[in-house]
């Protein structure tokens, strides 16, 4: 049962100016919405060719970047200033290297609107949920990508984020780490009834883990198709999954003609 939209993007466009003063368009009239999760969270994805503006779109949603036109709404209110309501995790997640795991999470709470500030029980619960129990005193720069990614997820959850944006997180990971991170994200989405939006150029990944998929065209990026996934039929070897992947590939071929996927 839907309870209204958590995220709405209305006619968002973005232009940049080149070094010679030339103006070029990255995004063109983006429109999409994600409903409020009821139980079990919601996992949506944006699939696009490489260099199509999906990272720019994620930054606009999180209010790190300003749109040239249009607006982003969170629960019906314009969202244009980062406050922890929307948290963006880039392809290479970053934390404060001079802070240990627990300090990084505590700082995320301090700068957010989360009413549960200084709630050590909540912090310990989140540390456990992301698999970092016993590593509270460790520093992020000492560890692997997977470790730093877990810190970023913990910071987002501790800040009370209503939406977590994850930008192409699996591109450079080997299969074992990738599967581990995917399972972690899915578990956290369910446990915390969390809305997660991630971007990728990998059709297979998106179809296997998403409830909803948005197709973003080659630059200037436009959302030209929205696909709902029937989760009851989601099995890696199923004919249904194969047919959805085939449909997406054909849609891109017909729309862009030059799909530059990874």
What residues fall within each predicted segment?
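Helix-to-loop junction immediately C-terminal to a conserved catalytic motif
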Residues: 62
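Conserved ABC transporter NBD signature motif
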Residues: 70-82
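Q-loop/switch helix immediately C-terminal to the Walker
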Residues: 92, 99-111
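Conserved ABC ATPase "signature" region
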Residues: 117-135, 187
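Conserved ABC ATPase signature
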Residues: 139-143, 147
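Hydrophobic anchor residue at the start of the ABC signature
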Residues: 153
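Catalytic Walker B motif of ABC-type/P-loop ATPase nucleotide-binding domains
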Residues: 164-168
């Amino acid at each position: 049962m839907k309870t209204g939209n958590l995220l709405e993007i209305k006619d968002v466009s973005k232009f940049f100016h080149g070094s010679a003063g030339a103006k070029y368009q990255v995004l063109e009239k983006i429109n999409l919405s994600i409903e409020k999760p009821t139980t079990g969270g919601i996992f949506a994805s944006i699939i696009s060719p490489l260099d199509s503006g999906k990272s720019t779109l994620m930054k606009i949603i999180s209010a790190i970047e300003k749109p040239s036109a249009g607006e982003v709404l969170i629960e019906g209110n314009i969202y244009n200033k980062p406050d922890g309501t929307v948290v963006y995790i880039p392809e290479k997640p970053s934390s404060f290297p001079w802070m240990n795991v627990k300090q990084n999470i505590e700082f995320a709470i301090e700068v957010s609107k989360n009413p549960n500030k200084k709630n050590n029980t909540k912090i310990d619960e989140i540390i456990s949920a992301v698999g970092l129990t016993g590593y509270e005193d460790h520093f992020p720069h000492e560890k692997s990508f997977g470790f730093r990614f877990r810190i970023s997820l913990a910071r987002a959850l501790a800040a009370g984020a209503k939406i977590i944006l994850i930008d192409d997180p699996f591109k450079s990971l080997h299969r074992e780490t990738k599967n581990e991170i995917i399972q972690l994200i899915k578990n956290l989405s369910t446990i915390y009834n969390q809305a997660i939006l991630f971007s990728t150029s990998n059709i297979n990944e998106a179809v296997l883990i998403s409830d909803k998929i948005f197709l973003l065209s080659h630059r200037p990026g436009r959302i030209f198709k929205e696909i709902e996934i029937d989760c009851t039929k989601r099995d890696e070897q199923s004919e249904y999954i194969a047919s959805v992947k085939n449909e997406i590939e054909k849609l891109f071929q017909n729309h862009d003609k030059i799909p530059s996927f990874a």
